[in-house]
């Protein structure tokens, strides 16, 4: 009987020591900021505000900005830049370096492009070499067999820098033959007197064609400027604006 009494008394003592289940504001509030004696489930630890377990801002478990679990910028879990998980990784938004387009590089030598190192000369469009008769069968045959060795483009300056066609053509022939001769000679090919004579005739015809083309374009540009600078056109444009 004594043993049974002692066991019963021990059970009653243990029951008194067991905590009661948490009710409203008792021993373990389910909601923050209610000051329950047992502490709530979302305590402000480390001096931070609501939801700051380590002193950061709202939703900052380790002191970073909004949505920054480890101190980085917005969307930066480990301190990198925007969209950068670790500073240098995951840079999906970084633009790729543009590649050089060789077509644009080649286009620099197209018709009308200013040639560097030639004092403002431009290189004309490629032309078909003219069919020229030199007055004897030998030279005619020689030309047909060697015409591919002669220039098919000419160097020239703008037509407004010359007082007449003859000056334009003379300058065009000299600079074109000089450049072609120097370039070809460096490749180990030499020209005879017959070659020079034929080149002069060929290049002269091409320079005349280039002058006519450039003169027509120049006068068309001038006509357009005169048209748009006339008072009626200016008045019409101002009315439309």
UniProtKB/Swiss-Prot annotation:
This protein's record includes keyword Zinc:
yes
**Which residues comprise the propeptide?**
224-241
The record lists its disulfide bonds as 172-207
Where is Cu(2+) 2 bound in this sequence?
Answer: 62-64
Which GO terms fall under molecular function for this chain's record? copper ion binding
Lipidation residue positions, type GPI-anchor amidated serine: 223
The annotated region (5 X 8 AA tandem repeats of P-H-G-G-G-W-G-Q) lies at 44-84
Which stretches of sequence are listed as region Disordered? 18-100
Name the domain of life this protein comes from.
Eukaryota
Q: Which InterPro entries does this UniProt record tie to the protein?
A: Prion (IPR000817), Prion/Doppel_b-ribbon_dom_sf (IPR036924), Prion/Doppel_prot_b-ribbon_dom (IPR022416), Prion_copper_b_octapeptide (IPR020949), Prion_N (IPR025860)
UniProt subunit comment: Monomer and homodimer. Has a tendency to aggregate into amyloid fibrils containing a cross-beta spine, formed by a steric zipper of superposed beta-strands. Soluble oligomers may represent an intermediate stage on the path to fibril formation. Copper binding may promote oligomerization. Interacts with GRB2, APP, ERI3/PRNPIP and SYN1. Mislocalized cytosolically exposed PrP interacts with MGRN1; this interaction alters MGRN1 subcellular location and causes lysosomal enlargement. Interacts with APP. Interacts with KIAA1191. Interacts with ADGRG6.
Function statement: Its primary physiological function is unclear. May play a role in neuronal development and synaptic plasticity. May be required for neuronal myelin sheath maintenance. May promote myelin homeostasis through acting as an agonist for ADGRG6 receptor. May play a role in iron uptake and iron homeostasis. Soluble oligomers are toxic to cultured neuroblastoma cells and induce apoptosis (in vitro). Association with GPC1 (via its heparan sulfate chains) targets PRNP to lipid rafts. Also provides Cu(2+) or Zn(2+) for the ascorbate-mediated GPC1 deaminase degradation of its heparan sulfate side chains.
- UniProt free text on domains: The normal, monomeric form has a mainly alpha-helical structure. The disease-associated, protease-resistant form forms amyloid fibrils containing a cross-beta spine, formed by a steric zipper of superposed beta-strands. Disease mutations may favor intermolecular contacts via short beta strands, and may thereby trigger oligomerization. Contains an N-terminal region composed of octamer repeats. At low copper concentrations, the sidechains of His residues from three or four repeats contribute to the binding of a single copper ion. Alternatively, a copper ion can be bound by interaction with the sidechain and backbone amide nitrogen of a single His residue. The observed copper binding stoichiometry suggests that two repeat regions cooperate to stabilize the binding of a single copper ion. At higher copper concentrations, each octamer can bind one copper ion by interactions with the His sidechain and Gly backbone atoms.
Q: What is this protein called?
A: Major prion protein
Upper lineage is:
Eukaryota, Metazoa, Chordata, Craniata, Vertebrata
**Gene of origin?**
PRNP
